[in-house]
């Protein structure tokens, strides 16, 4: 059984995120739209493809979307959770696919701009949709309460994958990563 680590952004570390200039979704610093509008850079995230319920057909993602970052001069992240989505660089997506990330719930190419519509990076990014109920949970949390309302201090898997998603709500904005990848990530 492989030991896993949680790889994501802790809501308790907003100060650390601010130092690294990672935009904070919870504070409205990230807006997503199908068409960039300089008068409404952060519209409500209410598109046919942005929300769906179990049992209904999941609408296809658009070919591209705009991600607008407030107060940004550049892009300072490889992945960023946004509701039931991840904004992630193509480089990061390629890396996690190499180590077992095989989920495919739909994605759009992302154009990252500031509030003036100026391009913030030439690097390719994607908006990757996550469908919680489609995730086969291959993770064991030995110290998690039966009601799954808490966070576990330990997680393990028997999966061949080294990068997994969890169907546990508390881990929805994070990746579960095999400890043996720690050094590769730091490269």
Positions of PLM-derived features:
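Phosphate/anion-contacting hairpin/loop surfaces
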Residues: 1-187
């Amino acid at each position: 059984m492989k030991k896993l680590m949680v790889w994501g952004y802790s809501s308790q570390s907003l100060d650390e995120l601010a130092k690294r200039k990672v935009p904070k979704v919870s504070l409205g610093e990230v807006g997503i739209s199908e068409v960039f509008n300089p008068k409404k850079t952060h519209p409500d995230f209410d598109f046919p493809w942005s929300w769906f319920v179990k049992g209904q057909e999941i609408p296809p993602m658009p070919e591209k979307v705009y991600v607008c970052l407030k107060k940004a001069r550049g892009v300072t992240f490889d992945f960023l959770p946004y509701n039931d989505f991840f904004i992630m660089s193509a480089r990061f997506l390629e890396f996690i696919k190499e180590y077992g990330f095989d989920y495919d719930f739909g994605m759009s190419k992302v154009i990252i701009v500031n509030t003036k519509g100026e391009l913030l990076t030439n690097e390719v990014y994607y908006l990757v949709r996550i469908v919680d109920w489609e995730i086969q949970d291959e993770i064991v949390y030995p110290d998690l309460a039966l009601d799954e309302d808490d966070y576990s201090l330990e997680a393990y898997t028997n999966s061949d994958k080294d990068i997994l998603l969890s169907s546990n709500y508390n881990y929805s904005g994070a990746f579960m990563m095999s400890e043996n990848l720690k050094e590769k990530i730091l490269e």
